[in-house]
Amino acid sequence: MGNNLEATKNKYSISQMTIAFVVLTVVYILRGKILFFLGPSFLNSGNGKLLQAIVSLVIALICAHFANKFAGKSFKVFIKRIEQGKVRWLTALFCVIVFILYLAKASQWVQVMHKSVMSIITILLLAVAAGLCEEFLFRDLLFNLFTKILSKRRYVLLWSAILSSICFGLAHFVNLARQDFVVTFQQVIAVTAIGLMLCTIRILTNNMWLNVIMHIAFDISPLVVTGDIIGKWSAIIVSGLWIGGISLLTIWVYNHHCLKENLK
């Protein structure tokens, strides 16, 4: 299957892609520190949060551009997309579970719409910034990096999804700078599962834009601004097992299907 992977055609070496990922991730993480000279009193005000959101979006766009450049300037996983065939039934089940997950998010979207105009704009800007940059960093550049490294392995898609999603989850430990360990650890677990879901979407669609849109939609929440706790451990574990489990199963079955198709 390696010959059909877009990442194997990338002119950048593994070391160049790795350095690019590390540098761009650090820049993205530190984006909130750029306006430190304005002082906490202003930055915690409505205008301050809006300004930070605008700066975050600008930096996110720049990082996303360079991430895609080092990923090979392509949104594809496969050079030629392999049809799902009999795997469609599992894809349908995956879509149902994702729909239920987003249906549960609807209450947060309603909460956002009841906030002030400035707060709504701030939340939307932050969601777009995160959706764009994090997808192009983790589901484009890092995923492609792992597919290039593991291109000779049979289950390259599965391992690339697992490793990039674990990195995506671990990256959220930077939030320890502003919140306690329990909240952060909950985020790491939840985000790792969401990362698997987004990898599944990218693999099945052979594109980037649907998972960018879904990431943005997932981040449209009042919690983006307030930083409140995610929820109870039971809810985190159950939802993580459901979405992470169905994502892993879908990728594994599709990866196996791709191997069989390549032998024909």
Regions picked out by a protein language model, each given a short descriptive name:
Residues 1-76, 220-223, 227-264:
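N-terminal, membrane-interfacial amphipathic/helix-forming hydrophobic leader that caps
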Residues 9-15, 39-51, 68-137, 143-149, ...:
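Juxtamembrane helix-loop-helix connectors linking adjacent transmembrane helices
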Residues 24-33, 97-105, 165-174, 216-226:
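Aromatic-anchored segments of alpha-helical transmembrane domains
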Residues 56-67, 94-97, 126-140, 196, ...:
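Hydrophobic cores of alpha-helical transmembrane segments in multi-pass inner/ER membrane proteins
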Residues 132-137, 141-142, 146, 170, ...:
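Active-site His/Glu-centered metal-binding helix of metallohydrolases
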Residues 136-163, 203-207:
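Membrane-interface helix/loop boundary segments of multi-pass membrane proteins
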Residues 173-189:
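Interfacial helix-loop-helix junctions of multi-pass membrane proteins
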Residues 184-240:
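Functionally important transmembrane alpha-helices
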